[in-house]
Amino acid sequence: MSLFTSFLLLCVLTAVYAETLTEGAQSSCPVIACSSPGLNGFPGKDGHDGAKGEKGEPGQGLRGLQGPPGKVGPAGPPGNPGSKGATGPKGDRGESVEFDTTNIDLEIAALRSELRAMRKWVLLSMSENVGKKYFMSSVRRMPLNRAKALCSELQGTVATPRNAEENRAIQNVAKDVAFLGITDQRTENVFEDLTGNRVRYTNWNEGEPNNVGSGENCVVLLTNGKWNDVPCSDSFLVVCEFSD
């Protein structure tokens, strides 16, 4: 065999062998791929939400329990007045009730009698009396308007002597200069009692009344029993007069 022939045969064998290797490689698997399976990998990220589907048909389940009542709503506006109802039947005539006040009247009369007795006892023990008149002196000095108010509260009046005996009684109970219930406030030198009646009995001190300063419109009883005109705003003792 010549050298050329040998070379040609070697080339043919090489080509056949290479083709055989190629086919064998295609029919076999790689070393890594043909080994045992590996572990599962981590889950991938969630995909995007799909489009909203159509509303399904109502289910066939049982109805749930009723929920708790809600809060009371605000009061509504007042309604229109209703129509007048029918007149009811006339009621029976009531019976008159008479209240017996006999016992109460008797008790009131007894209390009044007791008060009169107490008042008389006080007047007799703390005052001078002439007949049915009692004269009681205060220990405070005040102008005539307050003197009138004080005697009025005690159900009396400012003492006004009608005669010499009453004048002495007032002098004895006062024991100091005291107002008399006599003025000439309405008409100068026309002296009247506090009810507006002109006085008939007088007992002026010598030279009185002199109306010094044109403001002496009230009268006081001096300690000697004589009278003197003074301003009504001056303060003197008060003698109140009470009648039995």
UniProtKB/Swiss-Prot annotation:
The alphabetized UniProt keywords are: Calcium, Coiled coil, Collagen, Complement activation lectin pathway, Complement pathway, Disulfide bond, Hydroxylation, Immunity, Innate immunity, Lectin, Mannose-binding, Repeat, Secreted, Signal
Q: Which Gene3D superfamilies match?
A: Mannose-Binding Protein A, subunit A
- Example of a GO MF term: protease binding
Q: List the disulfide bonds.
A: 151-240, 218-232
Q: Where in the cell is it found?
A: Secreted
Task: Please give an example of a GO cellular component term from this record.
Answer: protein-containing complex
The annotated regions of Low complexity compositional bias extend over 65-74
Keyword Coiled coil annotated: yes
Basic and acidic residues bias: start-end ranges: 45-57
Disordered as annotated region, ranges: 43-99
Chief subcellular location: secreted
Q: Where would one find the signal peptide in this protein?
A: 1-18
Q: Which residues carry this modification: 4-hydroxyproline?
A: 43, 58, 69, 78, 81
Q: Which GO terms describe its biological process?
A: antiviral innate immune response; cell surface pattern recognition receptor signaling pathway; complement activation, classical pathway; complement activation, lectin pathway; defense response to Gram-positive bacterium; innate immune response; killing by host of symbiont cells; negative regulation of viral process
The chain positions of domain Collagen-like read: 38-96
Matching entries from CDD domains are given as:
CLECT_collectin_like (cd03591)
Q: What does this protein do?
A: Calcium-dependent lectin involved in innate immune defense. Binds mannose, fucose and N-acetylglucosamine on different microorganisms and activates the lectin complement pathway. Binds to late apoptotic cells, as well as to apoptotic blebs and to necrotic cells, but not to early apoptotic cells, facilitating their uptake by macrophages.
About its domains, the entry says: The coiled-coil domain mediates trimerization.
Q: What is this protein called?
A: Mannose-binding protein C
Which organism was this protein described from?
Rattus norvegicus
